[in-house]
Amino acid sequence: MASPHQEPKPGDLIEIFRLGYEHWALYIGDGYVIHLAPPSEYPGAGSSSVFSVLSNSAEVKRERLEDVVGGCCYRVNNSLDHEYQPRPVEVIISSAKEMVGQKMKYSIVSRNCEHFVTQLRYGKSRCKQVEKAKVEVGVATALGILVVAGCSFAIRRYQKKATA
């Protein structure tokens, strides 16, 4: 299901909303995308492709956007345009097409589908999903430390009162 307000143009990044994560592809025109697909990220994969995080390899594929999206929602998301100058569309598309069929190392943390398409569009590999997760883990860790410290303080205070 497409975003009703913006049709993709060649060179646009497409964010596809899967259950629990987003899959990313590069729109190359005429209804086609190029994307980095681990073995479980098959067209219309939906929630079953969440297991792609366990894979250590992936293939660059050229497929119809509607097939990759399946029943999921998607949108054009060039949100890094405000940070980086996109490469010329011709360079983005030709670079992507040259990679079709290649097998690549895959890592959910450092070499995933979002890293792949941002590298093509901007010449820089970025993944906001991973960056956001790192921040969330950091916040959760900090909160955990505060809770432990607070409990420790309360226990010591209670022990002092009990022995006084």
From Swiss-Prot:
Please indicate which superkingdom the organism of origin belongs to: Eukaryota
The annotated region (Interaction with TGM1) lies at 124-164
| Membrane side Cytoplasmic: residue ranges | 1-134
- Give me the reactions it catalyses: a 1,2-diacyl-sn-glycero-3-phosphocholine + H2O = a 1-acyl-sn-glycero-3-phosphocholine + a fatty acid + H(+); a 1,2-diacyl-sn-glycero-3-phosphocholine + H2O = a 2-acyl-sn-glycero-3-phosphocholine + a fatty acid + H(+); 1,2-dihexadecanoyl-sn-glycero-3-phosphocholine + H2O = 1-hexadecanoyl-sn-glycero-3-phosphocholine + hexadecanoate + H(+); 1,2-dihexadecanoyl-sn-glycero-3-phosphocholine + H2O = 2-hexadecanoyl-sn-glycero-3-phosphocholine + hexadecanoate + H(+)
| Membrane-crossing segments per the record | 135-155
Keywords, ordered alphabetically: Hydrolase, Lipid degradation, Lipid metabolism, Membrane, Transferase, Transmembrane, Transmembrane helix
User: Which InterPro entries does the entry mention?
Assistant: H-rev107_PLA/AT, LRAT_dom
Cystine links in this protein are: none
Q: Which of the residues are on side Lumenal?
A: 156-164
Record PROSITE patterns:
LRAT
- Compartments where found: Membrane
This protein's major location comes to: membrane
- Known EC number: 2.3.1.-, 3.1.1.32, 3.1.1.4
Q: What pH dependence of activity is documented?
A: Optimum pH is 8.
According to its UniProt entry, the function of this protein is described as: Exhibits both phospholipase A1/2 and acyltransferase activities. Shows phospholipase A1 (PLA1) and A2 (PLA2), catalyzing the calcium-independent release of fatty acids from the sn-1 or sn-2 position of glycerophospholipids. For most substrates, PLA1 activity is much higher than PLA2 activity. Shows O-acyltransferase activity, catalyzing the transfer of a fatty acyl group from glycerophospholipid to the hydroxyl group of lysophospholipid.
Subunit relationships: Interacts with TGM1.
Entry's family note: Belongs to the H-rev107 family.
- Protein name stated in the entry: Phospholipase A and acyltransferase 4
Organism of this sequence: Homo sapiens
Q: Which gene encodes it?
A: PLAAT4
